[in-house]
Amino acid sequence: MSVSELKERHAVATETVNNLRDQLRQRRLQLLDTDVARYSAAQGRTRVSFGATDLVCCRTLQGHTGKVYSLDWTPERNRIVSASQDGRLIVWNALTSQKTHAIKLPCAWVMTCAFSPNGQSVACGGLDSVCSIFSLSSTADKDGTVPVSRMLTGHRGYVSCCQYVPNEDAHLITSSGDQTCILWDVTTGLKTSVFGGEFQSGHTADVLSVSISGSNPNWFISGSCDSTARLWDTRAASRAVRTFHGHEGDVNTVKFFPDGYRFGTGSDDGTCRLYDIRTGHQLQVYQPHGDGENGPVTSIAFSVSGRLLFAGYASNNTCYVWDTLLGEVVLDLGLQQDSHRNRISCLGLSADGSALCTGSWDSNLKIWAFGGHRRVI
């Protein structure tokens, strides 16, 4: 078969796939007679009152010399760990902006970091395909090198995300470019379960993000370059419980809704979406006006009530605050005076929801506090 014939067959196959995708999209729209925004408007719900003075930048954390890729809060809300292209993990006191630890990593190409529930250890992973655990009680040498207390080896691709199981310092879940997620026993360093891989219900491309349910720690969501998100139960690793479609690009970030029965996603297609894990339905699409000008969604987080969705975007150095009920942007942090000078790569809310931290390719982190008399939403 000639090259021209192969190209022609490829073009025909691509057109067929696109047509089938359009048919699936139209069929889903027919099955769903409404979405959250239309239903809320019909019920007379009004837009949440939220303005530029309600979320203000109170601190800028400076110390990294490279792009910030990941961050995480401790459960007690006053410490943040960040991972950067400069090859260091920095633990910050969020109240004073002081650095309490600056850990030099064995591999500079770090992509993710996470605090243990007790706040005594941090985990990180990246292009070395290893998830490394550091004890914050260990003594660093003069170069800032802290001995690795545990190395979780087993992935055959980069480690894209790691998260401790809530209230369990001994268990952690990682996602990887090898198309799998792994549940680890941190105490022994051994795999407990592998999700995906040889199983047909697993992802068919790199897994980029995971989020564990706060209401049921046996459930977690994974997002992948195959444009899907999948629900898993750690008690039955052999197959995904449910697969969620809708995105037209890599699913870069996933986050459980506060009630534990819904979750949000952010994608390279520039949209955020809200799904219900019980019905498998897509509830809402959050898409900014002006197709594609904001670029991919890099990171998301929900307020403690779920009424607000914070979404970072790769373009325009912006973070939108969405009203999840009405599907409207109520605040653009990119327009604030103290906004980032480069793309927002990661963000997260403190445990009590009183502060938002954003990390950026401008090497800085910023802490945004709910200003004035406003209560946490």
UniProtKB/Swiss-Prot annotation:
Q: State the phenotype upon gene disruption.
A: Shorter hypocotyls and abnormal roots architecture; more auxin-induced lateral roots. Enhanced susceptibility to necrotrophic and vascular pathogenic fungi, such as Alternaria brassicicola, Plectosphaerella cucumerina and Fusarium oxysporum associated with a disturbed expression of genes involved in cell wall metabolism. Longer and wider primary roots with faster growth. Severely compromised root waving and abnormal root skewing response. Hypersensitivity to ethylene (ACC).
An example Gene Ontology CC term for this record: cytoplasm
Would the keyword Membrane turn up in this protein's UniProt record? yes
Is the Transcription keyword given for this protein?
A: no
**Chain positions of WD repeats:** 63-93, 105-135, 154-185, 202-233, 246-276, 292-323, 339-369
Swiss-Prot/TrEMBL keywords: Abscisic acid signaling pathway, Cell membrane, Cytoplasm, Membrane, Nucleus, Plant defense, Repeat, Transducer, WD repeat
Binding partners and assembly: G proteins are composed of 3 units, alpha, beta and gamma. Interacts with the gamma subunits GG1 and GG2. The dimers GB1-GG1 and GB1-GG2 interact with NDL1, NDL2 and NDL3. Interacts with WNK8. Interacts with XLG2. Interacts with RACK1A, RACK1B and RACK1C. Interacts with ZAR1 (via GBeta-binding domain).
Identification of the protein by name: Guanine nucleotide-binding protein subunit beta
UniProt source species: Arabidopsis thaliana
Q: Which lineage ranks, top first, belong to the organism behind this chain?
A: Eukaryota, Viridiplantae, Streptophyta, Embryophyta, Tracheophyta
